[in-house]
């Protein structure tokens, strides 16, 4: 990024911040509306190439970004959700942001591959790109500033570690995966498999995408239960919605979730935590979506010319019992 681009964005943030401070001190109007001499404040323009509707986790994450990058904070956030999770619509939005000369692009990709040309275009235009949640493949770190996300590999390892400890005798298990080609899916498989690969007491009897959806999680689980004559002891659902669908399938098969079949999920949405409190899920690994403030800090530091690490990990927690779930529910934000 050139000095001029950095300075332009930094001055915009600083100008808006000083204006807000001045208005607060004087008891003036809403921050972000005007400067002290009556002119409009210069806002830092952020192009957010987003995933769009994809379940409770995504809704919470993208709303958190929009609630953080406000005009009052000195930003003009241009929100561009994908059309039906279509990568082409994202690439078109990304290109439009580059052409319009936004100050920073936040990218949450529907698919990991296919971004090299777009990222090079932004680099040539001196527009910094920050990855939100999902990574890119190949992971060419020179093409973006940083990636901000919980650690998918470690989160999935946590699920596997819990399963090995909770069920020392092992058994048959299946995996409900997200859409093929998404980096998150590959990372979660990598983390989970790194633990289960050395566990001879466990046998993988099925793995199929259910596209992050409850209804597909149910139908895929139904199919795999029938194929294995209900002889499945553990289900790893790579997100909460698929796990909630698996609960329905297990119950309709005449089995008891949590007793006959243990189900573990990733995300930590309120519905999943409630299902754990109700003994229908056995383990929920949080994948914290609320990192708007971390992204805001990264944007400010980037525009100030500071060097950031290639990856900024968002801390997350786990829930391993109904008691832990019940304690968390009153303050659950998503």
Show which residues each predicted segment covers:
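Hinge/cleft segment of the Venus flytrap/periplasmic-binding protein
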Residues: 15, 27, 42-44, 176, ...
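Bacterial lipoprotein signal-peptidase II cleavage site
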Residues: 23-38
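Extracytoplasmic "Venus flytrap"
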Residues: 45-72, 78-94, 102, 108-112, ...
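Hydrophobic alpha-helical segments within soluble ligand-binding/sensing domains
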Residues: 46, 90, 147-173, 216-218, ...
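Short beta-strand elements at the ligand-binding edges of bilobed clamshell
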Residues: 79, 138-162, 175-177, 207, ...
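Flexible loop/hinge segments that line or gate small-molecule binding clefts
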Residues: 117-154, 172, 269-275, 322, ...
């Amino acid at each position: 990024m050139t000095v001029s681009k950095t300075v332009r964005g930094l001055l915009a943030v600083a100008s808006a911040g000083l204006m807000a401070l001045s208005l607060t001190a004087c008891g003036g109007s809403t921050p972000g509306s005007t400067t002290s001499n009556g002119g409009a404040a210069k806002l830092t323009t952020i192009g957010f190439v987003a995933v769009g509707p994809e379940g409770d986790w995504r809704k919470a994450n993208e709303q958190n970004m929009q609630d953080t990058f406000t005009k009052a904070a000195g930003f003009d956030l241009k929100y561009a959700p994908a059309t039906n999770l279509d990568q082409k619509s994202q690439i078109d939005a990304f290109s439009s942001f580059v052409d319009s000369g936004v100050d920073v692009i936040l990218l949450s990709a529907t698919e990991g591959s296919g971004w090299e040309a777009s990222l090079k275009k932004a680099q040539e235009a001196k527009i910094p790109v920050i990855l939100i949640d999902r990574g890119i493949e190949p992971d060419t770190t020179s093409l973006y500033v940083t990636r901000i996300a919980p650690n998918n590999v470690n989160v999935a390892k946590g699920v596997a570690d819990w399963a090995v400890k909770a069920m020392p005798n092992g058994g048959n298990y299946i995996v409900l995966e997200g859409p093929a080609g998404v980096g998150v899916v590959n990372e979660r498989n990598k983390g989970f498999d790194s633990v289960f690969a050395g566990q001879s007491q466990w046998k993988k009897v099925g793995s199929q995408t259910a596209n992050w959806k409850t209804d597909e999680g149910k139908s895929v689980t139904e199919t795999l239960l029938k194929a294995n004559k209900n002889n499945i002891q553990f289900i790893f659902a790579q997100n909460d919605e698929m796990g909630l669908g698996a609960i329905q399938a297990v119950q309709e098969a005449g089995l008891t979730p949590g007793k006959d079949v243990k189900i573990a999920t990733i995300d930590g949405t309120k519905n999943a935590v409630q299902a754990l409190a109700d003994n229908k899920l056995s383990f929920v690994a949080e994948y914290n979506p609320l990192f708007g403030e971390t992204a805001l800090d990264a944007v400010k530091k980037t525009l100030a010319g500071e060097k950031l690490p290639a990856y900024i990990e968002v801390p997350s927690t786990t829930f391993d019992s109904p008691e832990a779930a019940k304690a968390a529910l009153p303050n659950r934000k998503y």
